[in-house]
């Protein structure tokens, strides 16, 4: 698991020391993954700094840079977008579901450009650790709404995963969704 927090501080390589830190972090992660002969890598992308606004051009450039650098590895990527790494999603997520939908659309444009290296997108940006639980947007209706927005924004070649069998059943029950694009991730002990 490799985590990155998108910011508005980094601009272009060589002009900001933060890019050097990011590049060093990515290089170390790619090298670690390669030395372990990993074929899959989970990247967590934290959007917390943008809970109250759209992602900026700098943040989107940062996401693109992260994905481009990971293309140097032999790993396929599992991506999880989140607003919380500390189990406090209700205090760190956007106040309005439309902001999450906007973030989904913004990120999907870049993900589609890197679809050949992406195995799947895990979750729908909400919940503690991005795991779709303990969110203010946890109702079945809201989860289907968010899933529909993300699925409609992603290229058909990018799979999506939900957290539990119940979430999978709910999404499949929405008659406009194609089950060929879905996987479900087994629950963790935190789901109890």
Task: Label each region the model flagged.
Residues 1-32:
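Boundary/entry segment of secreted carbohydrate-active catalytic domains
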Residues 23-34, 43-82:
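Aromatic-lined substrate-binding rim segments of carbohydrate-active enzymes
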Residues 47-59, 84-99, 129-137:
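Surface-exposed, active-site-proximal loop segments in enzymatic domains
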Residues 59-71, 95-120, 146-149:
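An active-site-proximal structural segment forming one wall of the substrate-binding cleft
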Residues 78-87, 111-137:
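Active-site groove signature of glycoside hydrolases
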Residues 118-128, 156-171:
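Aromatic-lined carbohydrate-recognition surfaces of secreted/lumenal glycan-active proteins
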Residues 140-160:
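Active-site neighborhood of glycoside hydrolase catalytic domains
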Residues 184-191:
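Conserved small/polar residues in nucleotide/adenosyl-binding loops
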